């Protein structure tokens, strides 16, 4: 049976190719030509049969009662000859050269002449090219040409990145209906409805005279009951444009009653703009007005989670619910890496080693990735200028700092500091660290970068602590740690730098210290229950967690060996003690650990 299907498919492809090649030859040799399409000053000889087979528009035209002379020469108004030429060649060859400069014109013309094959190719092309800079234009095109597939794709792209895109100039040029199609969407990726309100009012003020009259209609798409009541009173009720609009003022009164717990009776004739029409049929069920809609946006399911990143996957752990969620596959992430989450909740991974055969001067490179929270994919960024390991990572004002470490080619200790600017998308060097060090740790807080401990050139642990001010470009000493150490955990917890475990001159350590940033003093905290190195500390939602690391474990041979452990502990501040939470979380194996905010709506529970 399979062989019969394969034969049938082979014959179909052969016949299709034969037919296509034959048609192309007939056009090029101008054989059996029975019509000419005219666009501007250009003429295009064609075959009625081919045009009719590929386009319902031309089929209806050639089968109509129009006199024969008009069928022989068809004048097409407002058609770019170059675009028409591309479409005709596609009909005869199944090949078309789409690019960013012509795709919208080809799309519009194929829509006008009802050529579904070209239309579909253009839709697929535009969907793949969606970007923050063009998504609103593509949304507008999809709505204009009544193409739900394209309009929905563009709208979902805008919704996922609403906080960024609502600041663009193109957003301010949306028509009222285009704006409504965006802000009525349940999928809007906003943590607070206040963001939607502020974007709408900025849109209104861009053309206040003309848009104030559309405010009532747009108003219905804002979900005011999701706002804090204080914000509603301070910013919505007191807005000068809202106060001067009688129609909107009636809705404000209803909303004030709703905040007081008095909802109106649902009505089948209730205004439904923003109540869900764009997301599906609303039917005849009783509805509240759209502005009373209290269904959370998809972006409102954001939660503080611990992100575990290893060379297999990035998994988010919720310590409150003891649940794990798949965030992204991570097969391209190197096992020995460092990771960082920025103040803007952007996750970066740096490290590992690969060979760039095209780079003859510096073939060894270190990976650099960023996690796209929308697509759950890792985006490759420019690699480190010099491959290194055992370095520290910091961040200030969205710039990433790679501090010291070991050169992967020479194994020499480093004091150099690299800075990545995401706007320029390139690396540069900044002020060197005062000493060469590796196996240290780096943490950022309040616009400063702190470098702690590590091993120096003589392979001895240091207790030195440095602070870097990016604005001044200098490193300064702070009070040293009580215990010199390397390969330890660090976190900012309740305004203090907390360090735990690590390697000392005497071996593995269980000691924990906290540095008071205000007093420049270290204090001893309760020891961790087990001596460990490479332990991860994470401060999440006011709680401090310790995850994994390496401990000396007795083997069956009775010998002790450094062994990876994958448990989770929580520091109970009131009792000043460590409490075990999970004996093993398998996703922690070989993982770096971060405190981040992720949208549960987009994640799959494991």
UniProtKB/Swiss-Prot annotation:
Keywords per UniProt = Cell projection, Cytoplasm, Cytoskeleton, Endoplasmic reticulum, Kelch repeat, Membrane, Phosphoprotein, Repeat, Sarcoplasmic reticulum, Ubl conjugation
| Stretches forming Kelch repeats | 346-398, 399-447, 448-495, 497-542, 544-599
> BACK domain: from which residue to which, for each copy?
135-237
For this protein, the record's InterPro entries field holds: BACK, BTB-kelch_protein, BTB/POZ_dom, Kelch-typ_b-propeller, Kelch_1, KLHL41_KL41B_BTB_POZ_dom, SKP1/BTB/POZ_sf
UniProt note on tissues of expression: Skeletal muscle. Localized between laterally fusing myofibrils in skeletal muscle (at protein level). Expressed at a lower level in the heart compared to skeletal muscle.
Residues found modified as Phosphoserine: 3
Return the Gene3D superfamilies for the record: 1.25.40.420, Kelch-type beta propeller, Potassium Channel Kv1.1, Chain A
* Main localization (coarse): cytoplasm
The UniProt entry, under SUPFAM superfamilies, shows: Kelch motif, POZ domain
Where's the BTB domain?
A: 33-100
Coiled-coil zones:
none
Question: How is the protein altered post-translationally, as described in the entry?
Answer: Ubiquitinated by E3 ubiquitin ligase complex formed by CUL3 and RBX1 and probably targeted for proteasome-independent degradation. Quinone-induced oxidative stress increases its ubiquitination.
Which PROSITE patterns does this one have? BTB
Q: What do the Gene Ontology cellular component annotations say? A: Cul3-RING ubiquitin ligase complex; cytoplasm; cytoskeleton; cytosol; endoplasmic reticulum membrane; M band; nucleoplasm; plasma membrane
Q: What does this protein do?
A: Involved in skeletal muscle development and differentiation. Regulates proliferation and differentiation of myoblasts and plays a role in myofibril assembly by promoting lateral fusion of adjacent thin fibrils into mature, wide myofibrils. Required for pseudopod elongation in transformed cells.
> What is the name attached to this protein's record?
Kelch-like protein 41
Task: Name its species.
Answer: Mus musculus
At the highest ranks, the source species' classification is: Eukaryota, Metazoa, Chordata, Craniata, Vertebrata
């Amino acid at each position: 049976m399979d062989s019969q299907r394969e034969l049938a498919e082979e014959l179909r492809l052969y016949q299709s190719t034969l037919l296509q090649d034959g048609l192309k030859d007939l056009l090029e040799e101008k054989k059996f030509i029975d019509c000419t399409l005219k666009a501007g000053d250009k003429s295009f000889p064609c075959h009625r049969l081919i045009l009719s087979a590929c386009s319902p528009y031309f089929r209806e035209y050639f089968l109509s009662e129009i006199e024969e002379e008009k069928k022989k020469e068809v004048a097409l108004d407002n058609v770019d000859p170059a675009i028409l030429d591309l479409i005709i060649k596609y009909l005869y060859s199944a090949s078309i050269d789409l690019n960013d400069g012509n795709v919208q014109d080809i799309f519009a013309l194929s829509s006008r002449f009802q050529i579904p094959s070209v239309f579909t190719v253009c839709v697929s092309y535009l969907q793949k090219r969606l970007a923050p800079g063009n998504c609103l234009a593509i949304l507008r095109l999809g709505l204009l040409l009544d193409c739900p597939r394209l309009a929905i794709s563009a709208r979902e792209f805008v919704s996922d990145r609403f906080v960024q895109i609502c600041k663009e100039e193109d957003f301010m040029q949306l028509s009222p209906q285009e704006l409504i199609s965006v802000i009525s969407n349940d999928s809007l990726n906003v943590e607070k409805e206040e963001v939607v309100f502020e974007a709408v009012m900025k849109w209104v003020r861009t053309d206040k005279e003309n848009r104030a009259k559309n405010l009532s209609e747009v108003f219905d798409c804002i979900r005011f009951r999701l706002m804090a009541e204080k914000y509603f009173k301070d910013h919505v009720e007191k807005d000068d444009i809202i106060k001067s609009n009688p129609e909107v003022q009636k809705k404000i009164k209803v909303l004030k009653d709703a905040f007081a717990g008095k909802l109106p009776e649902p009505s089948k004739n209730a205004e439904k703009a923003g109540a869900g029409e764009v997301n599906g049929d609303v039917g005849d069920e009783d509805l509240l007005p759209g502005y009373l809609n209290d269904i959370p946006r998809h972006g409102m399911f954001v939660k503080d989670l611990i992100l575990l990143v290893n060379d297999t996957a990035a998994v988010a752990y919720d310590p409150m619910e003891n649940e794990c969620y798949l965030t992204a596959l991570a097969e391209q992430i190197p096992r020995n890496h460092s990771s960082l989450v920025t103040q803007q909740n952007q996750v970066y991974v740096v490290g590992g080693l690969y060979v760039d055969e095209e780079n003859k001067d510096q073939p060894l490179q270190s990976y650099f990735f960023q996690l796209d929270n929308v697509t759950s994919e890792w985006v490759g960024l420019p690699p480190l200028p010099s491959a290194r390991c055992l370095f520290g990572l910091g961040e200030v004002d969205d710039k990433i700092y790679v501090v010291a470490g070991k050169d992967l080619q020479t194994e020499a200790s480093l004091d150099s500091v690299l800075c990545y600017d995401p706007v320029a998308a390139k690396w540069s060097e900044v002020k060197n660290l005062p000493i060469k060090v590796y196996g240290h740790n780096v943490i950022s807080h309040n616009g400063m970068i702190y470098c702690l401990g590590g091993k120096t050139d003589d392979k001895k642990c240091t207790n030195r602590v440095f602070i870097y001010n990016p604005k001044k470009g200098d490193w300064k000493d702070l009070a040293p740690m009580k215990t010199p150490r390397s390969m330890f955990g660090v976190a900012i917890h309740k305004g203090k730098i907390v360090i735990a475990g690590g390697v000392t001159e005497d071996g593995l350590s269980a000691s924990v210290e906290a540095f008071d940033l205000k007093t420049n003093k270290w204090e001893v905290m309760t020891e961790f229950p087990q001596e460990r190195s490479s332990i991860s500390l994470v401060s999440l939602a006011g709680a401090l967690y310790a995850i994994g690391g390496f401990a000396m474990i007795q083997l069956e041979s009775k010998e002790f060996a450094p062994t990876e452990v994958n448990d989770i502990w929580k520091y109970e501040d009131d009792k000043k003690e460590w409490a075990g939470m999970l004996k093993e979380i398998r996703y922690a194996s070989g993982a770096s650990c971060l405190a981040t905010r992720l949208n549960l709506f987009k994640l799959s529970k494991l």
